[in-house]
Amino acid sequence: ALGLEEVSKHVGKEPSGRQFDDLTLLARSASSNGFSRVPFNPMVNAGAIMTAGLIDPDDSFTQRLRHIRQQFGRLIGWTADDSPSAEMPRFNKNMARQENFKGYNNIAMGYLLMATGSLPHTKTDLHRDIHPDEDEFDFYIEPAVTEALKLYFSICSLEMTATDVAMAAATLANSGVCPISQDRVLSQKTVRNCLPVLQSSGMYNASGTFFQQVGLPAKSGVGGGVLLIVPQLMGICIFSPRLDAQGNSVRGIEMSKRLTSKYLVHTFDGTMTDTDRLDPKLPIARWEANSCGEAIWAASNGNIRTLESLVSQQRDLQTGDYDIRTPLHLASAEGQFEVVKFLLDHGVK
């Protein structure tokens, strides 16, 4: 593994603000550690081509693709002992060929990356021109570009089901450990470094709006899929091919927004709690008990400040506990008359 520092020399971590297939590169200052012109991030085409070129560049294409398929397989629960629980992603060669025939923009990007010096060279020796006749000549083209593009097109042609993608997302949500195989596929540090890039750049030019509304790391694809990660809880794949102007699944985004409107999973939900949404990390009985118990404790102890806070959070102050004791009941029994007045003034019956 190259590690974050080495990879960061070749590819950035910044949102591009451009189309995913744009040929513009990120210009970095001379004092930065790495090359002066690199892809903005691994999510755009240029970054994906670059990262493909960084994977074991001295191995053969077959070895590199097998390694990548195995790693994807491990993300979704595949194990080397041929466990029936999951399979390695299928390589669709016909799709890869179509990418090659039509991917001229990506081919141009590959050579642009080579021109900047950021795409690693292969260690293949240059062939010598052995034709003495000046009308017969041959020349050698550095294969790093074609090899990186070939691998990139092949990765784009791997086939996975929605269940597979959801399991891969769950592995990322589980700090790099596959939930069904218990295989540590990625280190915790790698996952921590990956999720912020998904958050800032995973939804193309709608990444900022998506994170504001949904608040979760995500990655969309032009095939209509959305990979959604709820750290330490679950991974989700939403598949609906109809795309919006940014190239994201229309229903995938709507589903994600509805998820965070019902459950407390937004990254910044800790700063805004209300009773209209459930905390999926807590058992429902415990969640209801916590919500009710805090109000009852504050009422019985005369803690109006806590009750004011609960009102601002839109908590329900009329719910009773297992004995059907409500905050108003406890405040009256304990002689907390200021609390009784406060509750009545706020519509508690």
Residue ranges and their predicted role:
Residues E159-C178, V230-P241:
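Active-site-proximal alpha-helical segments within enzyme catalytic domains
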Residues L2-I155, T163:
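Active-site-adjacent helix/loop patches that line small-molecule binding or acyl-intermediate pockets
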Residues E308-D316, K341-V348:
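Ankyrin repeat domain, specifically the short helix-to-loop turn at the C-terminus of the second helix
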